[in-house]
């Protein structure tokens, strides 16, 4: 019985020590990162909104959200991406 109580105490202490790490500001960032970009433009009519990926991501990207809630990564340096962003800002 003492062995079980000791193990339980170790588990509880370990859990308590690890809990603050999950509350760090980095853990709350749920913005996805993109590792590849779409090759061709999407139809503009299919896009309802966009957002930029976090600065913590290795590749900068614009994420377009389609009317069906699909997220598509695009290269922010491409002309069509900038034009779509401008169009979305105007509407």
Curated annotation (Swiss-Prot):
Residues 1-23 form the signal peptide. SUPFAM superfamilies: Interleukin 8-like chemokines. Its main location: secreted. It is found in: Secreted. GO terms for biological process: antimicrobial humoral immune response mediated by antimicrobial peptide; chemokine-mediated signaling pathway; eosinophil chemotaxis; G protein-coupled receptor signaling pathway; inflammatory response; positive regulation of cell migration; regulation of insulin secretion. One of its GO terms (cellular component) is extracellular space. SMART domains: SCY. GO terms for molecular function: CCR chemokine receptor binding; chemokine activity. Belongs to the intercrine beta (chemokine CC) family. Chemoattractant for blood monocytes, memory T-helper cells and eosinophils. Causes the release of histamine from basophils and activates eosinophils. May activate several chemokine receptors including CCR1, CCR3, CCR4 and CCR5. May also be an agonist of the G protein-coupled receptor GPR75. Together with GPR75, may play a role in neuron survival through activation of a downstream signaling pathway involving the PI3, Akt and MAP kinases. By activating GPR75 may also play a role in insulin secretion by islet cells. This is C-C motif chemokine 5. It comes from Macaca mulatta.
């Amino acid at each position: 019985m003492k062995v079980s109580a000791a193990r339980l105490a170790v588990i509880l202490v370990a859990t308590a020590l690890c809990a603050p790490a999950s509350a760090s500001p980095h853990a709350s960032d749920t913005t996805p990162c993109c590792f590849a970009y779409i090759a061709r433009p999407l139809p503009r009519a299919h896009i309802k909104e966009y957002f930029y990926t976090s600065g913590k991501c290795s590749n900068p990207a614009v994420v377009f959200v389609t009317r069906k809630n699909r997220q598509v990564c695009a290269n922010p340096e491409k002309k069509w991406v900038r034009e779509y962003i401008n169009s979305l800002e105007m509407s």
